[in-house]
C-alpha cells in the first residue's frame, strides 16, 4: 500500500501540464511586454524627444511666399508653385513642426461649393480642397524630405525637420490648387498616442509566429478532416474573415452611393455596370438603359479611338468607358451570371441596386471558404498524415497566391467575374475531389462504379460540373478547369473503357457518370449562349471587342513582340523597393511595342515565393502523392496555357493573375509539404516530423527545423507584400487617392521615427 508521501507526489502528466501552462504564461507576458515597449517607447519616440520643446511661436500667422494667397475661409491657393511656401522660425528645441489645417466643416463646405460649380458648368473640372497635401520643410537653407499629409489624419500634420533657423514649408502643388492649410508651428511637442490598430497588427504578427514556429504544438497535431474538433476549429477560424468582411458588406450596403464620374469633354466612368445589367434583366431586355448620343449613333465606326476623341471634342456625351456599344445600344461584356445570382435578387427585394463593392466582398468571402476547403482536401489527398501547422501554412500561402489580397482591395465591377469564377471553380473542384467517396450513399443509385475503380458520387459529379460550367457566365477562361476532370477520374475512365470493351458494363450503366457531368453543363451553358446570341448574334461572342477602351478592340491584338515580356512579367516581375513608406513601389515593365499594361508590384513567383515549389513538382518524382501527381501536373499545365492566353489577349494586367495563380498554388502543395515534413511516413505523423519530441524541436533534424522557419517567414513575406501593395501610390485605385486618411494614418506610424 503506498505511503502518504507517495500519494502526494504529482503524476508526470500533471507536471508536464503545469510546465506547459507556465511556459505559455511566460510567453504571453513576454509578448505583451514586447508590444507595450514597441508602442510606448519606439512608436512614441517623438513624444519623448520633444518633452523639452519650448512651444514658442513668433507670430499668429506665418509669412506667406508670393506664390500663396489666403482665401476668405482661411485656406490657401497656389498662384505660383515656385514661390509657394510658409515661413517661420525654429529655435532647435524640437525636431518637429506641426502644420495646421482648416476644420472639416470648412473643407466640406468648400468641396460642396466646388461640386455645385462643376455641375452648373456641364461637369467642368474645378479645383477642390486637397485631401492629400505634398509638402517639404527646409530648415536654415537645408533641403528637407518631401512628404504628404491629410487634414483628417492628425498625426500626419507633424513633420520631422531638425535644426534651428528660418524654416520654409514648401507647398508642392500645381497652380490653382486649394490647400486646406492655415499655418505651421515650430518648436512643438508631439503628443503621446497609443494606436490600437498598430497594437493589433503587432499582436497578429506575434500570434502567427507563435502558432507556426517549429516548436508549436500544431506541428504535433495530425490534420484530420473527419475530426469534429478540427472542423469546429476551422469554422471558428473562418468566422474571423466572415466577421471582418461582413462588417465591410454592411458598411457598403449602408453608405455606398452611385459611382458615376464625368468631366466635360471626357468619357463617363460608371462603375454600376452590374446594377445596369440587373435593371435590364428585370425589364426583360438584353441592352442597358443608358442614353446614346445622336452623334455616336450616326458614326459608322465608333470603335476608332480618333473618332471617339473627335466625338468628345464635339460635345458628344455620355460615352461610357469600358462599356460595349453595339448596334445602337450599350451592353456589358462582363459575365452575366453574377447579376443573375446577386444583383437581380437584391434589386427585386430591396428596390435598388446592390453596391458592386458589397457583391465583391460576398464573392471573395465565399472564395476564401471554398478555396480553403479545396486546398485542405488536396493536402489530405497528397499527404494524409501531415500536421495542422503545415496545412495552415499551405492554405494561407495558397490564398495569397490566388490574389485574395488584390480582390479584397479592388472592389469594382472588373473583379466581379474573377471572384465569382474563383468561388464556383473552388466549389466545383472540391466536390469532384470528394466524388470518389466510400461513404454510404443516401440512395444506392447515387453511386456509380466501373470495374475495380473507386465508386463515384453522381450528385457530387453533377454539382461540380454545374459549378465549373457556370464559369461560362462569369470568367470564361475558368471553364478550362473542366479539363482537370480527365486526370482526376482517369482510373474510372480507363475502367469504363475496359468494361465496355469486355462488355462487363452495360451501355446505359456506362452513360450514367458522363451524363451526370454533361447534362448540368448543358443546362447552364445553353441559356448563357442564348444570351450572347440575342445580344451579339453569336453564342460565343461576349461583346468584349465592342468595348470603348484604350484602343479599337475590334482590331487590337497584343503585339507578338510583347509576348515573351508579358509572360516573364506575369511570372518573374521583380519587386521594387524604396527608402520611404510604403517601401514598395510599382515595378517598371518596359515593352518592345506599345500594349496594355496595368501597374504591378511583382509577379506570382516574386510576391509569393513559395509558389516556386510548383516548378519543382516535375522533379519530385519519388515523392508519394497518392495518385494526385497527374492532376497536379495538369493544374500546372493549365496554368501555363492561361499565362500564354492572358499575355496574348489581355496584355499585362494584375487582375489576370487570378486566372492562373490558384492553379500554381495547388501545384505547389506537394513541394511545400515535402519541405516541412520530408517524405511521407508510412504509418504516423512522427515520421513526417522526424520523430518530434515533446517540445517539437529537440528531435527534429536541423534541416527540417530550418525549412519550417523558412516556410513560415516566406508566408509572412507574402502577407506583408500583399498588405504593403495596398499602399503603393502608382497602382490602379490607389489608396492615397481613394482613402487618403487611412493611407496617411498608417504612414504616420513610421515617418516621425
Q: Model segments located where?
A:
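Specific aromatic-rich, kink-prone transmembrane helix
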Residues: 419-450, 468, 663-667
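Hydrophobic, aromatic-rich transmembrane alpha-helices
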Residues: 581, 588-629
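Start-transfer (signal-anchor) and selected internal transmembrane alpha helices
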Residues: 1-43, 196-272, 391, 508-520, ...
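Interfacial juxtamembrane loops and adjacent helix segments
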Residues: 267, 271, 283-334, 399, ...
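Membrane-interface alpha helices of multi-pass inner-membrane proteins
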Residues: 426, 449-475, 482-486
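Perimembrane helix-loop-helix junctions
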Residues: 480-522
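Transmembrane-helix motifs of polytopic, lipid-linked glycan transferases
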Residues: 354-384, 427
